Design a protein with these regions (language model features):
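Conserved N-terminal/central alpha/beta ligand/cofactor-binding core
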Residues: 2-20, 25, 30, 66-204, ...
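Core beta-strand elements of the Rossmann-like FAD/NAD(P) dinucleotide-binding domain
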Residues: 34-36, 215-216
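N-terminal Rossmann-like FAD-binding beta1-loop-alpha1 element of flavoenzymes
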Residues: 38-63
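A detector of low-complexity, intrinsically disordered, Ser/Thr/Gly/Pro/Ala-rich segments
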Residues: 41, 74, 155, 225-228
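Alpha-helix N-cap/helix-initiation motif
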Residues: 43, 161, 215-216
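Flexible, glycine-rich phosphate/dinucleotide-binding loops
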Residues: 47, 70, 225
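Conserved small/polar residues in nucleotide/adenosyl-binding loops
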Residues: 217-224
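Hydrophobic alpha-helical segments, chiefly the membrane-spanning helices
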Residues: 228-234
């Protein structure tokens, strides 16, 4: 019998799932963040942004990149733009409309709860990108420009000419480099994750292969990556 993968999606109405989850989730005391180690596999737009954000929050982050540099991630290929429900054009946009268009654009194959969460945080993502220095196109008055793109019902696409993916990745890479310099993130380039270390059903580490030496490095916990079981970061 095939085991169904648990998606870990919270219970409840779709518009309330993540709000209720955040309201009842456990918190981390700011003084304890530096004691917690987090492994982020991948340095594309998602991985680099996550590693940089977690490092800036005070966690100890170990970031693994399969390429020579995070700038070689495929996120650079995105051209058209990035959508958010800011409704700058006053054309009736909303979180639900962005959610609906995204699910429909994905041929109804996406997990709807996760897409709704994406729509909820879309405005925050744009704010984060602007803070990272992404040069989005702007109107003559200085406000961020929008255009209608793809299957969207309204004008909600933020863009940087035809180089949106490249500019987003460079912004995330700059934020990541800042945290690497600050010592909160350790970056390991030319490493490929082979497997996840599970302890009682929970991910506690990874098995990574150095693509230069072809040696395997194992870790029962993220903290061991910073000691004798992993080489110093590149």
């Amino acid at each position: 019998m095939t085991k169904i993968i648990d998606s870990k999606i919270p219970e409840g109405p779709i518009a309330e799932k993540w709000t209720n989850y955040k309201a009842h989730q456990k918190l981390v005391n700011p003084a304890n963040k530096r004691r917690l180690d987090i492994i982020v596999v991948g340095t594309g737009l998602a991985g680099a942004s996550a590693a940089a954000s977690l490092g800036e929050m005070g966690f100890r982050v170990f970031n693994f990149c399969i390429q020579d540099s995070p700038r070689r991630a495929h996120s650079i290929a995105a051209q058209g733009g990035i959508n958010a429900a800011k409704n700058y054009q006053n054309d009736g946009d909303s979180v639900y409309r962005l959610f609906y268009d995204t699910v429909k654009g994905g041929d109804y194959r996406a997990r709807e709860a996760n897409v709704y969460r994406l729509a909820e945080v879309s405005n925050n993502i744009i704010d984060q990108c602007v803070a990272q220095g992404v040069p989005f196109a702007r109107e003559y008055g200085g406000t961020l420009a929008n255009r209608s793109f793809g299957g969207a019902q309204v004008s909600r696409t933020f863009y940087a000419k035809g180089q949106t993916g490249q500019q987003l990745l460079l912004g995330a890479y700059s934020a990541l480099s800042r945290q690497v310099g600050a010592g909160t993130v350790k970056l390991y380039t030319r490493y490929e994750m082979e497997d996840v270390v599970l302890v009682d059903g929970r991910a506690r580490g990874i098995i990574a292969k150095n693509l230069v030496t072809c040696l395997l490095y194992t870790s029962p916990s993220p903290r061991d990556l910073s000691t004798s079981r992993m080489p110093s970061s590149a």
